[in-house]
Design a protein with these regions (language model features):
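Acidic, turn/loop-rich segments in luminal/extracellular domains of secretory-pathway
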Residues: 245-324
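Active-site region of glycoside hydrolase catalytic domains
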Residues: 330-365, 370, 451-742, 753-831
């Protein structure tokens, strides 16, 4: 966090709001900053060169000042309570819990309103109604289920409606082009010309001898390459141009209405020189309805016609290659306060010889299940892991001294802290908030040995100059929250399941208690918190768990209709945890940051059409990007909780108390995803899955061992989309599965070069975290996928770390210089 962060919070917090609304910390803080917050147009537009990224959103206060207090005038605040929690009982903290009116629909319903305006509207609603509003109502998935895991006829009806809509849209799509342009001459020859133009229209085609590209410097000193896409239409039809994704190697490009383009390379390529490519879709559809010969008639055959004749003769894909000549004087540094880090999670890395096992988690039970092991649905057990539970001291030393890091992201295992249920701790008497007496009751239930262990880990990190980032929940759940072997048959059959994880309506509240407890216990050591890790990713692996096709994660069922319930409950849990952490972590652990800087980590996969001319592929990519990359930030930043999973902003889906519950957005990127479209969503409950991803061959130099394409352009794309939410970003995971360490060095240099370029052009990115520090248990895939900068030697008692020299040299070369060294660019940037 920046030095300016606390000053900004202090300057912008309205003391009147803090005094009048004592228990609504973050909402009151935001209410005091709405009028003075800079508008979106005042923010550096990181997506100015990317026409398909939303308008930059209004930035919000990333920290959140502590404005809590007791309504009877005593010092019973969370801050005061935390100071005495370990030594003497203190009166419970009083809390005035208020509800918030819905966001004004005049702003929400407008397609032109930015997300920042919607967020500001939500914040104003908080301030205006805090004293008089009724109780907060959390979002609820509309259904006809008698219990959360029952089958729901509504899902089937919604699916049928979607199928019909998809087919009807496909039938009428050709006619949306509008009436054809009239012939210039109404005489007989004009009529014949019209017939030819309408039924034998020419497809846009590349120019035989396009103009050469030109490199120049702008008045701001930016390197740009200009040229023309080089496509013509023999009929003189108007052409439109759409850039697909981002340039492959991290640059930006815009294309004008006449096909002229302006390409800007990322700073590293501008300094060294090299090549980049980008893809443009060119179409003559705007000229009106016409047919491109006999095959063009296939456009009137819904869905199948697009499969047989992609584009229908209207659209072509054009790939442009640009060459950049080096320019001297390009700044390749990072800000002094930039966070460089590595990461691992508890379940994945703690286990190993000499480490105590944690049999109380759902994942431990899942990977030890004899049936799962017999069927090959799991690939490893934590007992064979790298033993981070006992090697944390030496790992911290390596991260600091050999890798040059200043941050280490870890997870604290819920099942280690609370192996038994905390349901008996009732927080309903405080209207759903956690009080000091609740925390003391939780403390009596906690495993104090594990509490002390994690404090020792945090102490070791700080002793080695590493700032901790703590993930509150990194997928795993205690068995009393989720017993996958009991839940699997019950959920699959639609029967009530007592411990169904995030499908249970009680899980968000239990998670709130856990988050509050961690903040209370470790707030003096931790400022940076991630509530949940990759909340959308398990939707596929848990509820479309097709054996040997999709990785099977607990509970491993075929119940896609439950996806929305899973997501909504996680969103509710995140919001509750966000408020709880801000309430109980009021101690600044690092000199320059806020007491609590809270976000969530979000896996983002940019989908691209496998063939941009194929409308079905485009639809599949668009649906994926909207749901997978946007659902969760829409819910907890904008307050739009798409409870019915239809992608439509309905009046009842905006919840002001859910909005602006992020101080930073953690971005996790590994690679991109080409999509082959179906034209319909074949799986009921999964409207985002309108096609299937195309994997690459691991033999390719730009393909990971996970068979996923790796391209810096995809990294830029997701970072620009994430930045459009107006929150600071933190890259909380970026890495590649590469067992022989031949692809990882280039991956690191080129992806970090994208980060440097974005930061230099104004994007607020606080840090970069590589996943992972050491090879670990990659969930159902076992130990086959190796992401680590180190391996571990199981033949040594201390599980000695085995370095991967090329990757360590590349990453430490960047972190220790806080810049992109020339020698690394020469070695790894594409020619």
């Amino acid at each position: 966090a920046d030095d300016a962060l606390d000053d900004e919070v202090a300057d912008e917090t309205d003391p009147d709001v803090a005094e009048d609304v004592p228990a609504v910390d973050d909402e009151a803080d935001d209410a005091g900053t709405v009028e003075e917050a800079p508008l979106a147009e005042d923010v550096t537009d990181v997506g100015a060169d990317a026409p398909d990224v939303e308008e930059a959103r209004e930035p919000d206060d990333p920290g959140g000042a502590d404005v809590s207090g007791d309504i009877d005038g005593t010092d019973d605040s969370p801050a005061a309570a935390r100071r005495t929690a370990q030594t003497a009982p203190v009166d419970e903290v009083s809390a005035a819990v208020t509800d918030i009116d819905p966001v004004p629909m005049s702003l929400i319903e407008s397609d032109t309103a930015t997300a920042g305006q919607r967020s500001a509207a939500a914040t104003v609603a908080v301030a205006d109604t805090a004293a008089t509003a009724p109780a907060v109502v959390d979002p609820e998935v509309p259904s006809w289920r008698p219990w959360p895991t029952a089958f729901d006829l509504r899902t089937g009806l919604t699916y049928v409606k979607d199928l019909i809509t998809s087919v009807v849209d496909a039938v009428f799509r050709p006619f949306t082009a509008g009436a054809p342009a009239p012939s210039a001459d109404p005489a007989a020859w004009g009529l014949l010309a019209w017939v030819r133009r309408e039924f034998f229209n020419s497809t846009p085609s590349p120019v035989a001898n396009p103009l050469p590209h030109t490199q120049s410097l702008t008045v701001d000193g930016e390197v740009v390459v200009t040229g023309n896409v080089g496509v013509e239409d023999a009929d003189g039809d108007e052409l439109t141009y759409t850039v697909i994704g981002r340039p492959l190697n991290g640059g930006t490009v815009t294309v004008a209405a006449d096909g002229g383009f302006v390409y800007r390379p990322m700073n590293a390529m501008a300094a060294l020189g090299g090549t980049d490519t980008f893809t443009v879709l060119v179409s003559d559809e705007h000229a009106g309805l016409h047919v491109h010969g006999l095959f063009g008639l296939l456009k009137f055959v819904p869905i199948v016609g697009e499969l047989l004749y992609p584009g229908g003769g209207d659209r072509i894909e054009r790939t442009i290659t640009v060459t950049v000549e080096p320019v001297a004087g390009i700044d390749l540094t990072f800000p002094d306060e930039f966070h460089w880090g590595v990461a691992h999670s508890g379940f994945q890395a703690e286990g190993g010889p000499g480490s105590p096992v944690d049999p109380a988690s759902d994942w431990y039970r899942w990977v030890h299940d004899p049936l799962n092991r017999l069927l090959g649905l799991v690939g490893g057990v934590p007992e064979n892991g790298p033993g981070a539970y006992v090697s944390y001291e030496s790992d911290a030393a390596l991260a600091r001294d050999e890798l040059g890091m200043n941050t280490f992201r870890i997870g604290i295992e819920w099942s280690r802290i609370f192996p038994d249920s905390t349901a008996a701790v009732d927080i309903s008497d405080e209207d759903g908030t956690v009080s000091l007496s609740d925390l003391q009751a939780l403390d009596a239930l906690a495993d104090q040995g594990e509490v002390a262990h994690y404090r020792a880990v945090l102490d070791a990190l700080r002793a080695h100059g590493l700032e901790p980032m703590v993930t509150v929940n990194h997928f795993t759940l205690p068995l009393w929250v989720h017993d996958p072997l009991v839940a699997r048959p019950l959920i699959q059959l639609g029967l009530p399941a007592p411990a169904a994880g995030w499908l249970s309506s009680t899980t968000p509240q239990e998670f709130e208690k856990y988050a509050a407890y961690l903040a209370w216990k470790y707030g003096d050591q931790v400022d940076n918190w991630a509530t949940v890790n990759e909340p959308f990713s398990p939707v596929l692996t848990e509820f479309l768990a097709i054996p040997w096709v999709v990785p099977n994660w607990p509970p491993g069922v075929l119940r896609p209709d439950l996806a929305s319930t899973f997501l909504v409950n996680q969103a509710i849990g995140h919001v509750a945890a966000y408020d709880a952490i801000h309430a109980w972590d009021t101690t600044v652990a690092a000199a320059d940051g806020p007491a609590a800087f809270v976000g969530f980590t979000h896996n983002m996969i940019p989908a691209r059409p496998a063939n941009a001319a194929n409308r079905l592929d485009v639809q599949a990519a668009d649906a994926w990007n909207h749901f997978y990359n946007g659902w969760f930030p829409n819910a907890v930043i904008d307050g739009w909780v798409d409870v019915d999973f239809d992608g439509v902003r309905d009046d009842g889906e905006f919840f002001a108390h859910m909005a602006d519950k992020v101080d930073f957005l953690g971005v996790q990127y590994y690679g991109s995803q080409p999509m082959f479209g179906f034209g319909v969503a074949p799986v009921p409950g999964f409207p985002f899955l309108r096609g299937f991803p195309i994997r690459c061959s691991a033999d390719s130099p730009t393909c990971s061992d996970f068979d996923q394409p790796t391209d810096p352009g995809g990294f830029r794309e997701v970072l620009e989309v994430a930045a459009s939410y107006g929150k600071p970003l933190w890259i909380t995971e970026n890495g590649i599965a590469d067992d022989d360490d031949t692809k990882r060095p280039s991956y690191l240099v080129n992806h970090i070069a994208v980060v440097q370029d974005l930061v230099a052009h104004g994007t607020d990115i606080r840090g970069y975290t590589y996943w992972s520090f050491v090879d670990n248990l990659e969930w159902a895939d076992g130990y086959d996928l190796q992401f680590g900068l180190y391996g571990s030697d199981p033949q040594t008692p201390e599980l000695e770390r085995t370095p991967k020299p090329a990757s360590i040299a590349a990453l430490s070369g960047i972190t220790t210089s806080n810049a992109l060294p020339w020698w690394l660019l020469e070695q790894y940037l594409p020619d």
